[in-house]
From Swiss-Prot:
GO terms for biological process: lipid catabolic process. It is an enzyme of class 3 (hydrolase). The lineage of its organism: Eukaryota, Fungi, Dikarya, Ascomycota, Saccharomycotina. This is Lipase 1. GO terms for molecular function: triacylglycerol lipase activity. It catalyses: a triacylglycerol + H2O = a diacylglycerol + a fatty acid + H(+).
Amino acid sequence: MSVTSTSLNGTFNGISEDGIEIFKGIKYANIPYRWAYAERIDDYDNGVFDCTQEGMACPQVLPFDYNIEKGPKEMPFDEFECSNLMITRPQGATNLPVFVWIHGGGNLAGNGYCSDHNPVPFVKHSIVAGRPVLHVMIEYRLSAFGYLAVPDTNGNWVGNWGARDQYTALQWISKHIVEFGGDPSQITIGGESAGSIGLHALMVHESMKPKEECIIHNVILSSGTMDRMGTGTISENAFKPIYDGIKTLVGDINTCSADELLEAQIKAGLDLGFYLQDDFFPPDWRNVRFKVSRVLLSDVIVDGTNFKNKINPAVRVTPENDFDHKVFKLYNISTEDTWEDYHYKMMLFKGDETFIRGNQQLELLFEQENIPVWRQLFDQIHPNDPSRLCHHAVDLYYMWDNWEMPEDKHAVARQYQDTLTKFVYGQDPWPVDKLHYVHDNQFEILDKSQFGDFRNVPALKFLLGFSAEELGELTKKYTGEGHYTL
């Protein structure tokens, strides 16, 4: 099964299985050298390409504990070949709505070919539901390869390589997806955690463009905004100390091996992929006017589970200032709490402070601009282990539906996929003036005034009274050494 494109000047041979066609490892850009801007490919020089094998992922360490049974898939890594994408479509697709997915992983790790992101069940169910969707997954540069700021030949600091890759991929999709049966006028882009943060970053980037030039219109943001990741100058985000630390360890950062660079970034303290305030973003990026048309905004009640290993007995907090005392009061934390109770309450706090606060900020901005927002609370617990609660990224189990789990959980997954495909089709997944609450195998449509029944509104209001920078300083002592958990 193949696609021969005159406009792309190439032939792409894919896989056809059980009514689904898959094209893997399509390069959307060339990366000429380390820390170079990706160069979009629009002409494939009359080549014939084997798209039956998984594409390369960006080299990465795995400093995370994964909240998924299947775990990170062993992948071939190549920093110069990771600018690729995978297209999954119904057989014979023509003019279908497109759903693009940006994977998470803290901008340090992850890949779209990982078995937990397999889109085949999603696409199959979209056919059954009568809303067939063409799905695209994108790879992009990660960790130091994607988010280290480096000085150029003029001494100016440049970065955001991974974010620029993501935008280049979206440009390729907008321009060329019609060759694979997608409708370029109906593209929805989604992401979870760092994927959602990245999508927010791309929306900020497009705020600098005239609306007619924008390619991001319909978005699904799940548990991640730029709010606490932010952008910064060299000193504010500590890029230069990290750069200097890596350079001290490896010598020439441009010619050292990928493995040497990865080992050095850990020792130098690069534990998340931050954004650089350069020409990719407007100076006042927190107060832009978004150009998107429709938004589905979602989070999870215990989004703070990705801090669970960083909240440890060695950093148990004793209230010392007004901020601490207020946090303890708002989350009903006591110095007499058992470790289990303290740990759970701190995860609630970190989830609010890191993720849900940002969603609340974005929702207010969207509403001020009359951009419709479908607000969702995804509080469905882990499908196989209730003790893991409704943790950060738990919605991915139900989005992709490719794990072994009880049939009632598969039913929840199918209903959730219905919700998402309706949004992708430009339909209302639920009334836009209502709240969508997913819990205990139920999909409830509630009045938005009931938001406070399921989220800590007094705490969110308190946290919104501080800037992200202030929160960064005030909450440093609340977490310690340890891996993030995805």
